[in-house]
């Protein structure tokens, strides 16, 4: 959603580090193996965006679509994952409104897509300031029975309310803010 798009880096990083040796110290990667999971255990099964230039494209193509201008450090092969129309809420701020056009049509049925794709964890990389949109996606994750990684500085995992909701549902939640 923004010029320095964490989702682009994440998608490229999974490709770039997929064969990393867990026994080595790898620059740019804190842990090759985290809790028994290797980078190559990450599989993309669904993707959501609101930009008309990205919706409908394969994820591998959409990540390099304007206004994203993140440095390309890995060639992401075609993934067979069509970007679906996401929910906007407050995810399109004043700055982004000048750069992208919201995709037409209704929001995809996020819960059903997460269920149909047998998603385990929803990783949320919305633009900073998208508090309402993040909370909406949190609700979708809980309804679909999937874990949630909040990469934004919006208090979700650290809030008793959300923590309790995830515990009650027996789901993991990680966050808040990818840098924390």
Enumerate the language-model features and the residues they cover.
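N-terminal glycine-/serine-/threonine-rich beta1-alpha1-beta2 phosphate-ribose binding loop
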Residues: 1-139
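Conserved anion/nucleotide-ligand pocket segment
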Residues: 2-5, 174-180
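Short gly/pro/ser/thr-enriched loop/turn and capping motifs at secondary-structure boundaries
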Residues: 8-9, 155-159, 179-180
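Structural alpha-beta junctions
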Residues: 20-21, 144-147
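Residue-level detector of anion-binding/catalytic polar loops
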Residues: 120, 147, 172
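Rossmann-fold NAD(P)-binding glycine/threonine-rich loop
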Residues: 127-143, 151-172
């Amino acid at each position: 959603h923004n010029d320095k798009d964490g989702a682009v880096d994440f998608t490229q990083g999974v490709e770039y580090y997929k064969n990393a040796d867990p026994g080595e110290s790898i620059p740019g990667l804190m842990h090759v193996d985290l809790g028994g999971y290797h980078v190559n255990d990450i599989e993309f099964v669904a993707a959501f965006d609101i930009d008309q230039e990205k919706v409908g494209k394969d994820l591998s193509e959409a990540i390099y679509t304007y206004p994203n201008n993140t440095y390309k450090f890995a060639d992401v092969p075609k993934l067979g994952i069509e970007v679906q129309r996401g929910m906007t809420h407050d995810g399109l701020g004043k700055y982004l409104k000048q750069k992208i056009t919201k995709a037409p049509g209704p929001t995809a049925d996020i819960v059903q897509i997460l269920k149909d794709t047998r998603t385990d964890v929803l990783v949320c990389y919305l633009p900073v300031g998208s508090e309402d949109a993040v909370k909406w996606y949190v609700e979708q994750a809980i309804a679909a029975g999937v874990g949630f990684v909040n990469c934004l500085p919006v208090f979700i995992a650290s809030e008793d309310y959300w923590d309790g909701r995830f515990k009650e549902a027996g789901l993991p939640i990680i966050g808040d803010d990818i840098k924390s």
